[in-house]
C-alpha cells in the first residue's frame, strides 16, 4: 500500500523531470538554429515572421500582437501554467511539503537569486542598464536538468531532487520579480477585474467545481485582464495553476483537474512551447566588429559574472552555511561536490534569462548584447558543470576500484 502511494506521489514528478531534461537537447538545437538563421541570408525572413501582426477576435473583442508577442505573452502563459501546477503539487504532496526537506533548496534558490542580482547591480550602478538586474537571477530548468541527466547519469537521486526543487523555487522567484518590477503602466480597472476573476477561480475550487472547461475559460479571461492591466500576462498561467483543484488527499490526486491538465500540457510545454520560444528569441545577430567591446559593457559583465559566478556563490555558499550551522543537512547520498556541481548548472539561465531580458531592455542593440551574454554565460556554466561532474565520476570510479 505504501509503495502504491509513493508511486502516485513520485510518478508525476518523474514524468515532469523526464520531459524537462530531455527537452533541453531540443532547446539547444532550436537556439543554435535561430542563431545560424539570424546570421545568414535568411535573417530578413526570420525577422519578418516574428514581427508580423496577428489579430484574434473581431472589433472591440479582438487582440492584435506580433507573432513574437503572442509567443512571449501567450504560449509562455501555458509554460507558466505548468510551472504553477508543478509548484502546487510539490507544496501539497511532494518535495516542498516538509519544511525540513525544503529549507535547503529554498534557501539555496533565494541565495542563487540575490547574489547574481547584487553582482549585476554592482557592474551597472548608475547605468541605464540597471533595469536588467533580474536577468542573472533566472535558471533554465530544462537545460539544467538536461545537463545533469546527460553528464551525471549515476548521480544520487537526492541531487536531482535538490536541483529540481531549487529550479522550481527559482521559477517562482522569477515570476514574483516579473510581476512586481517588470511591468508597464498599470491599468487598475483591468487589474481589479483580473483579481475578481482570480477570486472566482479560488471559489470554484473551494466549492469543488470539477468542470475543467470552467477553469480554462476563467483562465483565458484572467490572461486578457492581466494583458490589458500592464501586469505581465504570463502571471495568469501561474495563478490558474495554483488555483486548480488537486484533490483532498493523495488517493484522489490522480482524478483531479490539476493532474489531468499537467499530464496533458507538460509534454506540449517541454517539446513545443519552449523550443518555439527558444527559436523565436535566441536569434542573435553576432557583430564581430563590435564583439569584444560589447563583451566588456556593464550589462554584459553583470550578466556573465552574475550567472556564472553569482549562481555558484549564491547556491553553494548558502547551502554550505546552512549545513555547517546544522539548520539543514545533505540530501541522501549527496556530497558537497554534488552540491557544487548543481550550483554551477544553476548558472544556465538561457530561456528564462532571455525572457527577463526581453522585459528589461527596449533598445534592440542592448537586448541583442544581453542575449549573447546569456548564451555565453550559460555555455560556460554547462561546460564547467560537466567538468565538475566528470571529476566526481572519476573520483567515484577510482574509489570503487580501490575497494574492489
From Swiss-Prot:
Its main location: membrane. The keyword Ribonucleoprotein does not apply. GO terms for molecular function: sodium:proton antiporter activity. One of its GO terms (biological process) is regulation of pH. Keywords: Antiport, Cell membrane, Ion transport, Membrane, Sodium, Sodium transport, Transmembrane, Transmembrane helix, Transport. Gene3D superfamilies: Na+/H+ antiporter like domain. It catalyses: Na(+)(in) + 2 H(+)(out) = Na(+)(out) + 2 H(+)(in). Pfam families: Na_H_antiport_1. One of its GO terms (cellular component) is plasma membrane. Na(+)/H(+) antiporter that extrudes sodium in exchange for external protons. Belongs to the NhaA Na(+)/H(+) (TC 2.A.33) antiporter family. PANTHER family: NA(+)_H(+) ANTIPORTER NHAA, SODIUM ION/PROTON ANTIPORTER NHAA-RELATED. This is Na(+)/H(+) antiporter NhaA 2. It comes from Clostridium beijerinckii (strain ATCC 51743 / NCIMB 8052). The gene is nhaA2.
